[in-house]
């Protein structure tokens, strides 16, 4: 879904020509599809690498810790399916709230930093599997401030995820299982 929404206008020669014409006219976009990868989607949608770190630091549930440990490697490279479906984040009312709110807040921080000129706009297409802080550095054309802004976004995302991880400690992992 994200590809259809964010990338269709930039595909092919027509999209490239439109972007180059906008740059020539001084009307280049300040926020593009790659900006989400650089400043909001750490470890994948929802900032799930930060969720994994919060689980490893604060979770007391053995099932969450196991999934967190197994998801850390893929999460570093923005592959979040192990945590999304292993925890699960999908269809989990406790995890749904920060999954939606954290990227919104991180996007706002990244956009404001870009708009105010605190960081260069994302101008380079970087492979989505590049680890988060390196991705922001490369995507902004090697702006050394980009990983700092990305780290601020990650810390705020961590602060959003942590209370929900702690709340999940109070849930009984055996709920919903029938005894046989």
Describe the predicted segments one by one.
Residues 11-33, 84-180:
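Transmembrane alpha-helical segments and their short flanking loops
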Residues 2-99:
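Helix-loop-helix junctions within the multi-pass membrane cores of secondary transporters/permeases
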């Amino acid at each position: 879904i994200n590809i259809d929404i964010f990338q269709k206008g930039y595909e092919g020669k027509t999209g490239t020509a439109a972007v180059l014409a906008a740059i020539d006219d001084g009307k280049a976009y300040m926020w593009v599809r790659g900006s989400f990868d650089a400043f909001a989607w750490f470890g994948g949608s929802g900032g799930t690498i930060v969720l994994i770190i919060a689980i490893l630091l604060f979770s007391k549930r053995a099932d969450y810790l196991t999934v967190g440990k197994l998801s850390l490697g893929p999460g570093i490279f923005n592959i979040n399916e192990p945590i999304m479906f292993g925890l699960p984040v999908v269809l989990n009312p406790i995890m749904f709230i920060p999954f939606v709110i954290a990227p919104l807040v991180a996007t706002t921080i990244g956009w404001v930093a870009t708009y105010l000129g605190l960081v260069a706009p994302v101008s380079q297409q970087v492979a989505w599997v590049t680890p988060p802080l390196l991705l922001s550095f490369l995507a902004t054309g090697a702006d050394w401030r980009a990983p700092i802004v990305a780290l601020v976004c990650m810390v705020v995302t961590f602060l959003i995820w942590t209370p929900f991880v702690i709340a999940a400690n109070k849930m009984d992992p055996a709920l919903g299982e029938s005894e046989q």
